[in-house]
């Protein structure tokens, strides 16, 4: 989950001080979703699944690929990863992409969102330093395999795995030098793949990369926005007319509810939205930062020139939104006696909590930060419609993780009831938002496969329980993958325009044959049984 990159640090802090209960999400019947199916969405609405290169591909040292910052980080600081793992093999999509596409086809999905590994096609990060033809060939093969199976590729250009060479050369997104290098990298992708790729996402979750991945979040976000705008300008000038594609950016956001009816807590909730969502949406729509950020951050917030503002305004055909959870927001009063160094999180003057008056905002998933609040996605969509002139939107990530319970049989574990409930309720509220005029054009479940989840690694080991977030179980220790029966049938039937019975989704039972895939990790040679 991309959001885990942002909230992982907070989760670690929470888990260090509070015992984490090994209870899974308990579905609650809040709304009648029994009539929800594919026809509940507009004609042409896209359903798909998502992934990212470092979390999926593996083959870290194959095919001429250069090192990314995540290769360096996981090897140099393995103690920072909960299971001390890395993405060297990941779920081996580099070798097994045909198998994965076959699963997508079985699920009757329309599209697949994946990211290109910048260092796989530009090992040194710069076009002038050499293009890796093997990397180009891999993505051509993946794109062609998707199209041959009736799946639409949605391609993200940057999903956290920056070339280490650029980090070493000028500190990555903390330098304005990256703007031209990103533009050149994007142009290479447009040239090589744009005849078949019609949906481009420049950057995934700039908020996450800025606040957790760098030491100077305001500078990093500034350069990410300008790199995005430069790539969009180039695409629109040189490629969009002939290639007939669209381009946008993906932003992550939590929905924030006021902790109380106090006006200060209501202001805190709005301020939290400004600092997480408005930080990027305001420049993209108005060419400037939210006033709350300007007032609280002051001179530490880089200013856009008039030329930059003009380039930023409207630099998207669509906005991708990654939504997982919601939180209560309480005001933190200003203190004149605070002489400590300012930080992004302190600048907000907001205390975020998932509990109010002893009651959680919703059932908790496996991750300490992920509390299930489906209505939040509707509220966020309506907020975006009202505040930002109703842009075209794709839900580019939405999903949950849950604990593996070692007491369950394989058949019971594959039922995946809670994830079905999570998806169904979020789809219900998305459908409701569409009926209220929000222009949502597609939905991508996170994730196709259990995968390397950044600081959580492949598993979150808590009392010998492991968390999973994919529609396919990927067991690294046993080197196998298994389709989760009920969730696979749910997706397959839903996408066929089927209904899931007359009662709540939590009462549905299906029996799907289990597909087991084994990988010889020593040789990375996949076998499908």
Task: Name each model feature, range by range.
Residues 506-517, 521-529:
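Intrinsically disordered, low-complexity segments enriched in serine/proline and basic residues
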Residues 465-480:
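Glycine-rich ATP phosphate-binding loop
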Residues 478-498:
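Conserved N-lobe beta3->alphaC-helix segment of eukaryotic protein kinase catalytic domains
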Residues 12-13, 472, 486, 515:
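Generic short N-terminal amphipathic or hydrophobic helices
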Residues 4-11, 15-81, 106, 124-127, ...:
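Active-site region of glycoside hydrolase catalytic domains
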Residues 82-95:
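Active-site mouth loops of central-metabolism enzymes
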